[in-house]
Amino acid sequence: ANVTRRTFLGSAVASGVVTIVPRHVLGGAGHIAPSDKITLAHIGMGTQGFRELGGLLADPAVQIVAVCDPNTDSNDYLEWGKNGIRNQIRDYLGNPTWRENVGGCPGGREVGREVVDAYYARQRSEANFQACSAYADFRELLEKEQDLDAVKVMTPDHLHATVAIAAMKKGKHVLMHKPIANRLVEGRRVIETARQTKVATHLLAYGS
């Protein structure tokens, strides 16, 4: 029998482990039905967020339905090498001319929405595919995205705990980039909230 995304997430919570499930188990041979995909909001569309976005877009079990960042669209983000983020985005969009006349490092929620929609449009061969919402405030996102399964927290470090706790209290599973928090008391609150809400959580350590 097929396993829906919610059955899978519920089982992960009950067992307390993270399991990698083959595609054919989730949705039949080589295909995952849209209703069985894990719907994800990507919170934080800066340098590190875009560095890790491509892997999520390419995952057939995941559908990014929303992005969030207080910044709309700019090209003044810090990066480790010249044009590194722009070139990464070009690679996973299959578009070598993406923003060719724009200098600097791109970031912001509208850039995130543009990239997510462009990736899925290319995947579906639909020129105008639009399915990703963009929010300036993560609290508004959590209120409006009723069918959301999980969030990935890619904000600056000082917001990790705040966003994660708010998401867990809404019953959303949380994937968080390190660190859990900047302060010990906040880290403890994150762990306590995870135990109380019994949602699935995972911390991405350095290099993972």
Describe every region a protein language model picked out.
Residues 1-170, 188-200:
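N-terminal glycine-/serine-/threonine-rich beta1-alpha1-beta2 phosphate-ribose binding loop
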Residues 173-175, 180-208:
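A contiguous active-site-proximal alpha/beta segment in oxidoreductase catalytic domains
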